[in-house]
């Protein structure tokens, strides 16, 4: 597991032009959802309709249910905190997109499970919030994502 994660991080470093987050961001304690811990914040003004994030198969780590069950409990807890489910598989974003927190009141929306679009202008310094129910392709995925 550690070797695979190290490999994925090295791919991200080599492929910065293909990074999933398409905007400048920084991490800070969540102001909107303090119990969530760390949140993802805009480090630039974002215009309505601007792409915030796009999926990159090379930079995401995908676990089948069978592979996920092979992890020890501490690994499962880590990945449950930072993964989302799509088509019954666990997807782990290796960039800071994994720090997007959940709320019903969001400032961006997921489009066809491939990219996230700003729903409105987002000023620099605002926390970027998404609805975990939009992540996934099935009702089971949605329920799992919301329970994480």
List each language-model region with its residue ranges.
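Conserved catalytic SET/PR domain of SAM-dependent protein methyltransferases, capturing the structural core
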Residues: 2-148
């Amino acid at each position: 597991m550690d070797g695979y994660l190290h490999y994925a991080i090295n791919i991200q470093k080599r492929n910065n032009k293909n990074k999933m987050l398409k905007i400048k961001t920084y991490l800070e304690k969540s102001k909107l959802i303090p119990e969530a811990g760390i949140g993802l914040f805009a480090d630039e003004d974002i215009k309505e309709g601007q792409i915030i994030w796009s999926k990159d198969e090379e930079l995401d780590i995908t676990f089948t249910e069978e592979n996920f069950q092979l992890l020890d409990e501490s690994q499962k807890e880590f990945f449950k905190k930072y993964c989302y489910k799509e088509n019954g598989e666990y997807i782990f974003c290796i960039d800071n997109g994994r720090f997007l927190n959940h709320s019903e009141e969001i400032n961006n929306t997921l489009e066809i499970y491939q990219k996230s679009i700003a729903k409105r202008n987002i000023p620099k310094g605002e926390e970027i919030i998404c609805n975990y129910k939009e992540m996934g392709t099935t009702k089971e995925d949605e329920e799992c994502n919301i329970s994480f």
